[in-house]
């Protein structure tokens, strides 16, 4: 990558879950499948393990939770069915409306990159099966805690300005504290984190708030850059 190439001076960093992909619907589909496949009690046990693991790791690990569930249920023949459901889930059907249009808009304005948290198997699978890997032309970064890896992001995608699009205000705040006026934070109000008014109120207001990811298309590069200086 040529560090002086003007097309890379503005880099758009897109989150995946509840930013491009409706992950709440994915979780709801998994919940229904678990109840149908292993029953209400075992499904509840899976989600208890899932929440415990998320607390330990700092990200959602659906397959990791299934692995731990397997330790307690080593002879459950339904586990393979649940695994197939997860691995073969049609993530492309859960892309938010106009999410790809928003990505294409960003690509016209600069460089578009996926910047996500997650495990090293299921999250890449989600990015691939949703079609996002191809739409972003392979420009995908997945970390354990992405807000702690901004130096690596800069090394891989040097830019004079960054645009961070994420449904979690906590992460937008952390990135803004690190990059300051070099980043414009964009908050799509999608998903349960974004719609939790009490949670959102704990943090400073992002530079730009949009009701849906497709609304990013309404902003010119000049408007996006200017918003960082408010």
Provide a role label for each language-model segment.
Residues 19, 26, 120-121, 170, ...:
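Conserved Rossmann-like nucleotide-cofactor binding loop
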Residues 1-9, 128-164, 168-230:
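Asp-based, Mg2+/Mn2+-dependent phosphohydrolase catalytic module
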Residues 13-15, 115, 164-165:
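Generic enzyme active-site microenvironment
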């Amino acid at each position: 990558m040529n560090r002086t190439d003007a097309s890379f001076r503005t880099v758009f960093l897109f989150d995946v879950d509840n930013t491009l992909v409706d992950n709440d619907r994915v979780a709801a589909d998994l919940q229904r499948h678990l109840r149908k496949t292993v029953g209400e009690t075992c499904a509840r046990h899976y989600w208890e393990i899932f929440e415990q693991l998320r607390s330990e790791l700092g990200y959602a690990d659906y397959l990791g939770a299934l692995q731990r569930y397997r330790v307690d249920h080593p002879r459950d023949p339904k586990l393979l069915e649940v695994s197939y459901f997860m691995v073969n889930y049609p993530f492309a059907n859960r892309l938010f409306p106009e999410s790809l249009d928003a990505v294409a808009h960003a690509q016209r304005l600069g460089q578009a990159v996926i910047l996500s948290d997650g495990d090293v198997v299921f999250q890449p699978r989600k990015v691939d099966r949703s079609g996002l890997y191809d739409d972003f032309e392979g420009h995908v970064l997945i970390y354990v805690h992405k807000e702690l890896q901004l130096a690596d992001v800069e090394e891989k995608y040097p830019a004079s300005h960054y645009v961070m699009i994420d449904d979690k205000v906590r992460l937008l705040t952390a990135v803004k504290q690190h990059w300051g006026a070099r980043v414009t934070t964009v908050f799509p109000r999608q998903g349960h984190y974004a719609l939790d008014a009490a949670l959102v109120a704990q943090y400073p207001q992002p530079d730009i708030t949009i009701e849906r990811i497709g609304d990013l298309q309404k902003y010119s590069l000049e408007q996006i850059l200017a918003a960082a200086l408010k």
